[in-house]
Amino acid sequence: MEKRKDTKTTLAKASDDQNKAWYVINAEGKTLGRLSSEVAKILRGKHKVTFTPHVAMGDGVIVINAEKVRLTGAKRAQKVYHYYTGFISGMREVPFENMIARKPAYVIEHAVKGMLPKTKLGRRQMKSLRVVKGSSYAQYEAIKPIVLDA
């Protein structure tokens, strides 16, 4: 079997990262998983025609109204977040209701982080995510974000 020579794959250069767009997504009434997968897709750059898996070419995302995200079924009462304090018997469990009241940004960041690559590239892409409690994103007006209805 002979290899075809008429098809070419174009790969993006690392310098194409300069023209990063920023998007605003309202989390109010949206399901956590569906919202997170949409955000992860934008952070990775999969929505672009020039997507290259090994280059950080994704755009930035600002998520507003983080405290108004919803879960389906009985997960609102059953979902539990775990963390370790570093001490003996230091495993802690925090129910979703308490976490969304205390740290609403963490809930979305945790979900999106799980959908990105577990590499240096994934950690770099995670830096382009901003999660805001409430509907005001005035501190990000200088970057002229595009409001999405996603």
Swiss-Prot record:
Extent of the signal sequence: none
Alphabetized CDD domains for the sequence: Ribosomal_L13
InterPro entries associated with the record: Ribosomal_uL13, Ribosomal_uL13_bac-type, Ribosomal_uL13_CS, Ribosomal_uL13_sf
One Gene Ontology cellular component: cytosolic large ribosomal subunit
Any one GO molecular-function label of the UniProt entry: mRNA binding
Gene Ontology terms describing biological process: negative regulation of translation; translation
Superkingdom per UniProt: Bacteria
Binding partners and assembly: Part of the 50S ribosomal subunit.
Cited PANTHER family: LARGE RIBOSOMAL SUBUNIT PROTEIN UL13M, RIBOSOMAL PROTEIN L13
Function as written in the Swiss-Prot or TrEMBL entry: This protein is one of the early assembly proteins of the 50S ribosomal subunit, although it is not seen to bind rRNA by itself. It is important during the early stages of 50S assembly.
Stated family: Belongs to the universal ribosomal protein uL13 family.
Name of the protein in question: Large ribosomal subunit protein uL13
